[in-house]
Amino acid sequence: MNPNQKIITIGSVSLTIATICFLMQIAILVTTVTLHFKQYECSSPPNNQVMPCEPIIIERNITEIVYLTNTTIEKEICPKLVEYRNWSKPQCKITGFAPFSKDNSIRLSAGGDIWVTREPYVSCDPGKCYQFALGQGTTLNNKHSNDTIHDRTPYRTLLMNELGVPFHLGTKQVCIAWSSSSCHDGKAWLHVCVTGHDKNATASFIYDGRLVDSIGSWSKNILRTQESECVCINGTCTVVMTDGSASERADTKILFIEEGKIVHISPLSGSAQHVEECSCYPRYPGVRCVCRDNWKGSNRPIVDINVKDYSIVSSYVCSGLVGDTPRKNDRSSSSYCRNPNNEKGNHGVKGWAFDDGNDVWMGRTIGEELRSGYETFKVIGGWSTPNSKLQINRQVIVDSDNRSGYSGIFSVEGKSCINRCFYVELIRGREQETRVWWTSNSIVVFCGTSGTYGTGSWPDGADINLMPI
């Protein structure tokens, strides 16, 4: 090959390489632009059940890094299909309960702006748990906190924070409410918010941040609801509401709600005589609630809800170790599954229990007359055997020298089973602590565990002498 041929060959090869590089750069540019725009787009299937990929979404799915020569492109994978929750997994097998969360709201109020609250509860969406409470329209270190022992005022609102975050000044006020319930159906939050005059209150149904439906008082006597989470199965949410006397017969209804719209209302049926402040949990294919009888029984009523045909069955927890306060001592107390026990039934406190085969797990105040201390245990045969009293796996959550209050259940879906958790309201201030003029609370939260656990006590812990008056 002569020199001229060599020059021509080298030039041709160089031109070919330059052309290839030029085409590669064009391909890289096109790919970059395409991926840049596609990271904000999702192709929606016919049922339109895909969440849009928009820059405002905080919770991302996965991120892939694609390397092309020296260019790095970040490509976001669109979120998975959003589906209704069906809660069809079995209940987790547990040996007891382990500590999960504590917000220390009252202790923090001694030196910070924390809301005055009561009636707290916990509920979870598919990815995260939140704490709720009914605020009193004031912080604790504020003269408006005087006389906040009252339950129903137009200033009360439903507060919502991530679990473990106290209700600070930046807390979202979800709705106006002096009674409430909240639950997530797998797609969005439903909030049931009751407010208004005692004799003509309104319940608002807020779904996905929008008011969808409402219902007025049907007995003109303090319309009220659960003060803990409702339950949604396959898009149908159930909430138990009562209107009427707190110490005689009242009118309880179970509302069935789909995306915020009331689709059916069933009256309470069965042998339960008085039902308030139910603590409900999914028991596929239905919903099961353990409630407060404020009239005749210190044994707790059970309400079983059929989500498919809207039928209702009610009875009472069989355990002779009863769950309400006030109550008789354990030697004298009784329950025979069907009817109220007529033992110190007038008055009571919100509480919880759940079935475990023929047995029952339950929590209650340690005090038989006062809302002091808190304990949990399992009663063998307590769900099916009348007046069963064999107690095992007892745990002290709050020692008897410290105050407690309401308690309730919430459910958390794991990979293979559904766990049951509970919270305890730790009330401080009036009526018992008269040095101060306010009434508020903090919470402590435990969840079921299949492991081992130790002992302890987790009271509110605030020194009332260090608190604002």
UniProtKB/Swiss-Prot annotation:
It holds the Pfam family Neur. The influenza A genome consist of 8 RNA segments. Genetic variation of hemagglutinin and/or neuraminidase genes results in the emergence of new influenza strains. The mechanism of variation can be the result of point mutations or the result of genetic reassortment between segments of two different strains. It catalyses: Hydrolysis of alpha-(2->3)-, alpha-(2->6)-, alpha-(2->8)- glycosidic linkages of terminal sialic acid residues in oligosaccharides, glycoproteins, glycolipids, colominic acid and synthetic substrates. GO terms for cellular component: host cell plasma membrane; membrane; virion membrane. It comes from Influenza A virus (strain A/Hong Kong/5/1983 H3N2). It is a single-pass type II membrane protein. This is Neuraminidase. Disulfide bonds join 92-417, 124-129, 183-230, 232-237, 278-291, 280-289, 318-337, 421-447. Residues 36-88 are annotated as: Hypervariable stalk region. Coiled coil: none annotated. Glycans are attached at residues 61, 70, 86, 146, 200, 234, 402. The lineage of its organism: Viruses, Riboviria, Orthornavirae, Negarnaviricota, Polyploviricotina. The active site is at residues 151, 406.
